[in-house]
């Protein structure tokens, strides 16, 4: 096992495009770190730099106290699991798992012991004679993980390994991956664009956007105290509601002091709706119900703020002006009708305040 430290890591491609813009973070020994962000944010590029599949322009990558910038991937003591499984179609499951060990000249008895142990852990012992084409997607992914396990690396690297699986199987496999990592105690770095996957897997969450790290913390810390409006809107489903604090149709007070300009955020589950206005500190909104989504135990209410002639709005990307919708999460049966006029309120302790450009959280 080993810790992984990135110090001011940068990647600039020929032509001047800067894909990674000075990334710093540390993954502790045995921790499960998830890099999460939208497509094109640089998360897979960063993982490939840790693996040695992509060169770095500047900075240092430290694995277990050793700077690996100039070290070949095969010598970094890491194992990588890919999205497309990367299995040899003409080889059996056993030979796929044993192939890398044979190339390293490992004795046959040790190879067999490692393969059998990995197969036992992953519950694929009855499949060792099968070819990949005879396996389901989930079984193939287990074989890919088994191939990584037999190497007994210091660090596991996962590049969106569940993207090709259906929704039900993704849930099952992410539980298996987390259980496996805890059992082995091996440091892991995992890339995904799925914020739910990230929240459920991570010890430490690294939220990326356009080549920079927006926030680092535990999943609960990032969800409860987002550092920027990007994080607030990306982490959480449905996302946090964001609005200009001084826009028409937004009334917010904190104790006896009214706030000034800025961006106000509130999670959908922290809004309470009623048919009559409530006199309370915090946030008060007038809404017209535009759409309703019933998803079993809960219902999402989409409303539009009641206001006239106000062009202001807020975006997770400064400079953009999205529709001025508000989302409220309520228990499954508690929903008004489309077209109803409602009032939504939130207590001060449930509100989040950001600077006007969305780049800084302001503590209340």
Curated annotation (Swiss-Prot):
Organism expressing this protein natively: Rhodopseudomonas palustris (strain HaA2)
Subunit details: The complex is composed of two ATP-binding proteins (UgpC), two transmembrane proteins (UgpA and UgpE) and a solute-binding protein (UgpB).
Annotated function: Part of the ABC transporter complex UgpBAEC involved in sn-glycerol-3-phosphate (G3P) import. Responsible for energy coupling to the transport system.
Catalytic activity annotation: sn-glycerol 3-phosphate(out) + ATP + H2O = sn-glycerol 3-phosphate(in) + ADP + phosphate + H(+)
Cell compartments where the protein resides: Cell inner membrane
ABC transporter domain boundaries: 4-235
Any one GO molecular-function label of the UniProt entry: ATP binding
Record has Membrane as a keyword: yes
InterPro entries: AAA+_ATPase, ABC_transporter-like_ATP-bd, ABC_transporter-like_CS, ABC_transpr_MalK-like, ABC_transpr_MalK/UgpC-like, Mo/tungstate-bd_C_term_dom, P-loop_NTPase
Single Gene Ontology BP annotation: carbohydrate transport
Keywords, comma-separated and alphabetical: ATP-binding, Cell inner membrane, Cell membrane, Membrane, Nucleotide-binding, Sugar transport, Translocase, Transport
Pfam families: ABC_tran
EC number(s) from the headed UniProt entry: 7.6.2.10
Membrane topology: Peripheral membrane protein
Keyword RNA-binding appears in the UniProt entry: no
Taxonomy, superkingdom: Bacteria
Binding site for ATP: 37-44
Family note: Belongs to the ABC transporter superfamily. sn-glycerol-3-phosphate importer (TC 3.A.1.1.3) family.
Any one Gene Ontology cellular component term annotated for this protein: ATP-binding cassette (ABC) transporter complex, substrate-binding subunit-containing
Protein name: sn-glycerol-3-phosphate import ATP-binding protein UgpC
């Amino acid at each position: 096992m080993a810790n992984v430290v990135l110090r001011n890591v940068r990647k600039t491609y020929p032509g001047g495009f800067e894909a990674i813009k000075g990334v710093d973070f540390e993954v502790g020994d045995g921790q499960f770190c998830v890099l999460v962000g939208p497509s094109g944010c640089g998360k897979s590029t960063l993982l490939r730099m840790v693996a040695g599949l992509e060169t770095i322009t500047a900075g240092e990558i430290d694995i277990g106290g050793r700077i690996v910038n100039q070290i070949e991937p095969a010598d970094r003591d890491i194992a990588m699991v890919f999205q497309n499984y990367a299995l040899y179609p003409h080889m059996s499951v056993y030979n796929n798992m044993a192939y890398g060990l044979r190339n390293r000249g490992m004795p046959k008895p040790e190879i067999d012991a490692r393969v059998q142990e990995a197969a036992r852990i992953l519950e694929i012992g009855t499949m060792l004679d099968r070819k990949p084409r005879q396996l389901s997607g989930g079984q193939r992914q287990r074989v890919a993980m088994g191939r990584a396990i037999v190497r007994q690396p210091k660090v596991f690297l996962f590049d969106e390994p569940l993207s090709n699986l259906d929704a039900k199987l993704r849930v099952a496999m992410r539980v298996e991956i987390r259980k496996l990592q805890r059992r082995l105690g091996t440091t892991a770095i995992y890339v995904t664009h799925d914020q739910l996957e990230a929240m459920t897997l991570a010890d430490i969450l690294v939220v990326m956007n356009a080549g920079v790290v927006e926030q680092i913390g535990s999943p609960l810390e990032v969800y409860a105290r987002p550092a920027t409006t990007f994080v607030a809107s990306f982490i959480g489903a449905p996302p946090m509601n964001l609005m200009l604090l001084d826009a028409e149709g937004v009334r917010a007070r904190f104790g006896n002091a009214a706030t000034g300009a800025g961006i106000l955020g509130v999670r959908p589950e922290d809004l309470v709706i009623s048919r009559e206005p409530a006199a309370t500190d915090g946030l008060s909104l007038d809404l017209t119900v535009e759409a309703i989504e019933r998803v079993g135990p809960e219902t999402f209410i989409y409303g539009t703020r009641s206001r006239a002639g106000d062009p202001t709005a807020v975006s997770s990307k400064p400079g953009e002006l999205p529709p001025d919708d508000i989302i409220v999460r309520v228990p499954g049966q508690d929903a008004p009708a489309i077209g109803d006029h409602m009032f939504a309120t939130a207590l001060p302790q449930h509100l989040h305040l950001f600077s006007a450009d969305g780049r800084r959280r302001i503590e209340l």
